Amino acid sequence: MGEPSKEEYKIQCFDAETQQLLKTALKDPGAVDLEKVANVIVDHSLQDSVFSKEAGRMCYAIIQAESKQAGQSVFRRGLLNRLQQEYQTREQLRARSLQGWVCYVTFICNIFDYLRVNNMPMMALVNPVYDCLFRLAQPDSLSKEEEVDCLVLQLHRVGEQLEKMNGQRMDELFVLIRDGFLLPAGLSSLAQLLLLEIIEFRAAGWKTTPAAHKYYYSEVSD
């Protein structure tokens, strides 16, 4: 599998100077301030929902390049520190900007999906990711379609990996999701459909059956 071209990392959304910084970080990480690079990537991920879905791949590539070049992990440390800072103020972020909060959850799940230690997901990210998903499964979040959409998308992406790391918390999360599905009011029909789909997706071993795919995707397109 060849390395993706730099353009595939969707860095065109940055100004020319930042694009150059990111390109250098990918090719010659020792030549740039990698903590600054980590902050640039996190800042942009909180504002750009498309980039937040892509950034994990770029972060993984920079970590690999730095490890190969210098055997160090300055970038990874900077990235995890910044993720932790945002995690600690996540309620304030959600209150300030729902889009920023949804982007943060997308980003941390993306990082969890891509970053590996000895071929395993990073234990340090398991509980923060779960905490974010638990927050999305609270009644006040389930009344907002953007948050339901985010919850379901992230469970499609990392649910199976998360369950392997901590099955008990996944059971608890799905109790909340099932309770939310039965909320008497405040849930849109699309939100109900999405929650039912993810409940069935997990019950089928994190797979979509052909019948379910046909049913849900015809409903959503209608």
Swiss-Prot record:
A cellular component annotation (GO) from this entry: nucleus
UniProt entry tagged with the keyword Cytoplasm: yes
Coiled-coil region(s): none
Domain MIF4G per the UniProt entry, residue ranges: 3-205
Keywords tagged on the record: Cytoplasm, Nucleus, Translation regulation
Subcellular localization: Cytoplasm; Nucleus
Domain of life: Eukaryota
Gene Ontology annotations of biological process type: regulation of translational initiation
Any GO molecular function: RNA binding
Chief localisation class: cytoplasm
Disulfide bonds: none
Family matches, as Pfam families: MIF4G
InterPro entries for this protein: ARM-type_fold, MIF4G-like_typ-3, mRNA_TranslReg/HistoneTransl
Family classification: Belongs to the MIF4GD family.
Assembly, per entry: Interacts with EIF4G1, EIF4G2 and SLBP; probably tethered by SLBP to the 3'-end of mRNAs ending with the histone stem-loop, it also interacts with EIF4G1 which is bound to their 5'-end.
Function of the protein: Functions in replication-dependent translation of histone mRNAs which differ from other eukaryotic mRNAs in that they do not end with a poly-A tail but a stem-loop. May participate in circularizing those mRNAs specifically enhancing their translation.
Protein name: MIF4G domain-containing protein
Species this protein is from: Bos taurus
Name of the encoding gene: MIF4GD
